[in-house]
Amino acid sequence: MKRILLFLATNLAVVLVLSVVLNIVYAVTGMQPGSLSGLLVMAAVFGFGGAFISLLMSKSMALRSVGGVVIDTPRNEMEHWLLETVRRQANQAGIGMPTVAIYDAPDMNAFATGAKRDDSLVAVSTGLLHNMTRDEAEAVLAHEVSHIANGDMVTMTLMQGVVNTFVIFLSRFIANIVASRDSEEGEGSNMMVYFGVSMVLELVFGFLASFITMWYSRHREFHADAGAAQLVGKHKMIAALERLKMGQESHLEGSMMAFGITGKRSLSELMMTHPPLEKRIAALRNM
């Protein structure tokens, strides 16, 4: 879970920075914001640029945000088991060996991130290692490996790029209409209105668009559960989810939340990056 909210937050920050740059480009080049074709091209460049920059930064940012410690050489039997389990599952799934890390947190969680199937990260909380059985922890790891094998990070980035493009385009299109009505106040005032309205609308539309990315995240969780069931058996995956029902709420934030094993509770399922555990368990039982 930690993975998705961090990805979304990073993406939003990058898009806002790029939006400021886009306004500077307009000012320096004299390009008219009202040019629909030019605006659409610029929105796509900056929209996809923000998403892919977030993806490329995801491993380092994820490790830094949780204080993760990469396991290069196992220091104990638990770390040795963790490395060998991830290695075995990666071979089964046909992906390169991910970087494996442990981070200190009381909740039972794990997440995967990374720009490529052969250059990814799997991080596990100490709470998961201390409170789950080996079979349950193995299922959680298989879930994260399945996220990587399914290419969920890249497809999420592509979806976010499309969403960003429309957010930037619609925000600036509407801002141009609003600013045009105040053109009698002078060109300087006109640009300030355009800049202010476009930034506010990007925040509003970005929030509304997050419902789309959260829906996609929930959809991919079912696929990752199914992939884990193929790797280790559905009974282990069901046991892991049953254990999570008794555990604490996730402490993961940002983009990592979407690719964790579980997420935060919410009053509405629409605001959740993960489906309710009951639905995930039912889906596995019906396989």
From Swiss-Prot:
Its cofactor is Zn(2+). The active site is at residue 144. One of its GO terms (biological process) is proteolysis. The keyword Cell inner membrane applies. The keyword Protein transport does not apply. InterPro entries: HtpX_protease, Pept_M48_protease_HtpX, Peptidase_M48. Its EC number is 3.4.24.-. Keywords: Cell inner membrane, Cell membrane, Hydrolase, Membrane, Metal-binding, Metalloprotease, Protease, Stress response, Transmembrane, Transmembrane helix, Zinc. Gene3D superfamilies: Metalloproteases ('zincins'), catalytic domain. It is found in: Cell inner membrane. The chain crosses the membrane at residues 4-24, 36-56, 158-178, 192-212. It is an enzyme of class 3 (hydrolase). Pfam families: Peptidase_M48. Binds 1 zinc ion per subunit. GO terms for cellular component: plasma membrane. It is a multi-pass membrane protein. It comes from the Bacteria. Signal peptide: none annotated. GO terms for molecular function: metalloendopeptidase activity; zinc ion binding. Zn(2+) binds at residues 143, 147, 221. Belongs to the peptidase M48B family. This is Protease HtpX. The lineage of its organism: Bacteria, Pseudomonadati, Pseudomonadota, Gammaproteobacteria, Vibrionales.
